């Protein structure tokens, strides 16, 4: 089985990694942050705006691999502010169903790659 490395044109160019790796039906998505396609941070200080951009980036990554958000089976969420959890849940509900949610791990951390980032989400999906 071949391995396909994908960097969607709708995502900011990565530096030293791939946004998406597809092996068979399994899709691995690198941690997505609140950066638009031009590399600008979206929603500095605004948790909802950042979570929304992260989910847009996840959607784009999955679309580039032939999938969508319903194909996600695992997420790892890194969050710098505990008080952003309600905003995360609210925005996530717009993008993902709670009928069969993926397994998930939430990690509170002291910081991410850019001090303006409040959240980062990496995912694994199975695309039929």
Describe each region flagged by the PLM:
Residues 1-56, 60-73, 79-128:
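N-terminal presequence-like segments and the immediate start of the first folded domain
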């Amino acid at each position: 089985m071949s391995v396909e490395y994908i960097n969607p044109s709708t995502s900011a160019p990565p530096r030293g990694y791939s946004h998406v790796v597809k092996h068979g039906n399994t899709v691995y998505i690198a941690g997505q942050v609140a950066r638009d396609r031009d590399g600008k941070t979206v929603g500095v200080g605004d948790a909802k705006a950042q979570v929304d951009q992260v989910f847009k980036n996840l959607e784009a990554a999955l679309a580039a691999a032939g999938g969508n958000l319903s194909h996600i089976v695992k997420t790892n969420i890194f969050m710098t502010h505990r008080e952003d959890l309600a905003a995360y849940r609210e925005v996530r509900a717009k993008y993902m169903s709670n009928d069969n949610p993926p397994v998930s791990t939430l990690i509170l951390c002291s910081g991410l790659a850019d001090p303006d980032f409040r959240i980062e989400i990496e995912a694994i999906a199975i695309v039929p």
